[in-house]
Regions:
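Generic recognition of flexible, low-complexity loop/linker segments
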Residues: 41-44, 82-83, 93-96, 192-198
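M16 family metallopeptidases and their MPP-like homologs
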Residues: 1, 50-72, 78-188, 203-211
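A generic structural signal for well-ordered alpha-helical segments enriched in polar/charged residues
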Residues: 12, 16, 124-131, 193, ...
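His/Glu-based metal-binding/catalytic segments typifying zinc-dependent metallopeptidases
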Residues: 1-87, 229
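Short amphipathic alpha-helices in soluble, non-transmembrane regions
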Residues: 6-15, 120-125, 222-223
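In a subset of proteins, long, contiguous C-terminal domains/tails are tracked
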Residues: 185-229
């Protein structure tokens, strides 16, 4: 109802927006929007027997971390450490992480019988990276797996989606090429440098778990709020 009440005034304002913006910057006529982000840990309870367990956060200090190496570290975690700890040992149907060039990242599992053990595995991912010391052959296999994901043939829709993402993000082609070169030249030392980023995300990020009510209540101290879906 509030939206319906304000809609006429908004549409009227929209009609004059382009005229007011002519000859100047859009920032001169736009009201600045600042979103205040507050970390919150939520447990969302359902009748399900399993959980979807996620942590999302940001590393504010990315100094010393090569952006292209993030793809290699992600591949290493997804198909190595997390696969073994959360899928094989923990029994989850799936698990993954994402490490993004701006310092943001997340860990997530689905159809996961675990909760606290999964969160602990996320937090220990940094230790795994920090102690990474694989033989050159193993590292080469990881690099090949990473670069093959980047070079997978894409249908027109996927090419368009990628191009749109690059355009909206204003990422120059030179930066993408530099990151690709960093993937190919990745070393064990480069991988170990990503540990601080993984630690920041897992230790200071927000937790969100959707799943079994009893399991969530057993771990209620992890959450700021509990909701019933």
């Amino acid at each position: 109802k509030e939206i319906e009440k304000e809609l006429p005034a908004f549409l009227k304002r929209l009609d004059t927006f382009e005229q007011e913006a002519e000859g100047g910057s859009l920032n001169d006529v736009m009201t600045p929007f600042v979103m205040e982000l507050k970390p919150v840990n939520e447990g969302i309870m359902t009748p399900a027997e399993v959980q979807y367990v996620a942590i999302a956060g940001q590393c504010k200090d990315m100094s010393g971390i090569k952006r292209g190496v993030l793809d290699v570290a992600r591949h290493l975690l997804n198909f190595g450490y997390l696969w073994n700890e959360v899928r094989v040992k923990g029994g989850a149907y799936g698990v993954s992480c994402q490490l993004i060039r701006n310092g943001e990242g997340f860990f997530t599992s689905y159809r996961d019988p675990g909760l606290g053990s999964t969160l602990e595995a996320y937090r220990k991912a940094a230790d795994y990276l920090r102690s990474f010391d694989a033989e050159e052959r193993e590292l080469l296999k990881t690099i090949i797996g990473t670069i093959s994901g980047l070079d997978t043939p894409k249908p027109p829709a996927a090419k368009g989606k990628r191009s749109m993402g690059v355009y909206l993000s204003e990422i120059p082609e030179e930066v993408l090429q530099e990151e690709r070169d960093q993937v190919l030249a990745c070393s064990g030392e480069d991988i170990r440098a990503v540990a601080d980023m993984a630690e920041a995300i897992a230790s200071t990020g927000s937790i969100c778990v959707i799943g079994n009510e009893n399991h969530i209540r057993e771990e209620k101290d992890l959450f700021d709020k509990l909701l019933t879906l």
